[in-house]
């Protein structure tokens, strides 16, 4: 429990370098140390910001943000803020990309644990690695954005 008997939540997540620019983790993705993420909560009705906190990832690409209090009437999400390096620093911004990881910060939804796991978020590498077409073939995917496939 947090201050004043409120619920205290621990939002945990991971940041990776999307080395194939496909917006999910593959065997050639790397976890990012020193990446900054922000947890932002907004009231569903008023649209006003009710909570904001930043965290920096550790050497395994993991972060934890403590949130004191219930945010049942809010929409809360983790967004990428800053990459530790230029080589992998692009934030995905096309319509289909997952720019934010939504988290529920209330105990009124049947979730008993105080730990909330956010989906992993990835910065895009400037250009896909040369082995990406091979990696995608293993996954039965053949279209690597920005790469030239050879016949």
Curated annotation (Swiss-Prot):
UniProt PTM: N-glycosylated. Contains fucose monosaccharides in the glycan structure.
Pfam families: Pollen_Ole_e_1
Location relative to the cell: Secreted
Keywords: Allergen, Disulfide bond, Glycoprotein, Secreted
Residues that carry a glycan: 43
Disulfide bridge map: 17-88, 20-132, 41-76
Tissue distribution: Expressed in pollen (at protein level).
InterPro entries per UniProt: Pollen_Ole_e1_allergen (IPR006041)
Domain of life: Eukaryota
CC per GO annotation: extracellular region
Family per record: Belongs to the Ole e I family.
PANTHER family xrefs: F28N24.16 PROTEIN, PROTEIN DOWNSTREAM OF FLC-RELATED
This protein's name: Pollen allergen Sal k 5.0101
Organism this protein belongs to: Kali turgidum
Lineage: Eukaryota, Viridiplantae, Streptophyta, Embryophyta, Tracheophyta
């Amino acid at each position: 429990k947090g201050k004043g008997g409120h619920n205290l939540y621990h939002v945990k997540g991971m940041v990776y370098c999307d080395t194939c620019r496909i917006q999910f983790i593959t065997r050639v993705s790397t976890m990012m140390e020193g990446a900054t993420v922000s947890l932002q909560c907004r009231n569903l009705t008023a649209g006003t910001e009710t909570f904001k906190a930043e965290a920096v990832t550790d050497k395994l690409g993991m972060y934890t943000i403590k949130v004191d209090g219930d945010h049942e009437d809010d929409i809360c999400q983790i967004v990428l803020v800053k990459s530790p390096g230029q080589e992998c620093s692009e934030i995905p911004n096309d319509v289909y990309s997952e720019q934010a990881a939504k988290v529920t910060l209330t105990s009124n939804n049947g979730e008993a644990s105080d730990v909330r796991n956010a989906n992993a978020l990835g910065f895009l590498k400037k250009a896909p690695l040369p082995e990406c077409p091979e990696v995608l073939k293993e996954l039965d995917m053949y279209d690597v954005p920005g790469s030239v496939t050879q016949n």
